[in-house]
Amino acid sequence: MNHDNPKPDGNAELIVFDFDHTLYDGDSGSDFFYWLLQRNFWRKGLALLVTPLVAPLVAYLPTRRRALNVYIWIATLGLAKNEGLDHLIKTYVQQHQTDIQQRLLAPALAVFEQHRREGEQVVVATGAPPQLARAILELAQQSAFPVLGSILLPSWGALRLSRHCHHEEKMRMLRECGYADIAIAYSDSHADLPLLKAARKPVVVNPKAAREALFRQVLPEGTPLLNWGCKKRGGVRI
């Protein structure tokens, strides 16, 4: 399952949450794939070998997906089906349950749950695999809502990133699923500016301190910049 997207409720306000550094203190996808790379010495060694060439490319949007695919291919070599990925995600979450639960941001989850109680259509849109975000949120007893995430497909005996739910592609994926009229969007990242700009009310949470000026410049005056518990991030603490 790459995402779970029931038809939008036309009578409900649409609320979109990013996941990493918004609901969760960390980069869940990177942590998961790092764990996969550490499973045996040859994966770790091969990843270290390519890192000087590949790692700098991750920082740039035009080359980010291709660079990530190198690591994903190494991490999943021998795993040619998403069913195998689902099993590894379940194992990863079980083995790291205590740490993961500590990373879930209580103020964020309170806002998330409030929107759901009020009958609004809540969607999570993340650059991580959707199965991973869903498994993590289930630890907080949050389920039965749409999760859109990056799509992995079989490739040469491993998996590759077919669609990265990131930047403009995140908005394309939301629109394809019928989630276009966004009332409120929550995100930490300047890469989500297309999402934040599309929302009638953008809310920036846990931004990097160096990005706060950019958000104030390009988003509507009065846009909240909040901190929901990421100690190393900026925003007004609540």
Language model features: what each stretch is:
Residues 69-107:
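Metal-dependent phosphoesterase signature
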Residues 25, 77, 203-204:
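Amphipathic alpha-helical interaction elements
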Residues 41-43, 63-64, 79-87, 93, ...:
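General structural signal for secondary-structure boundaries
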Residues 2-64:
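Active-site neighborhood of HAD-like aspartate-dependent phosphohydrolases
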Residues 43-48, 82-83, 144, 224-226:
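Short, surface-exposed acidic
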Residues 2-3, 10-12, 88-90, 98-238:
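C-terminal cap/substrate-recognition subdomain and adjoining C-terminal extension
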Residues 62-70, 147-151:
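N-terminal-biased segments
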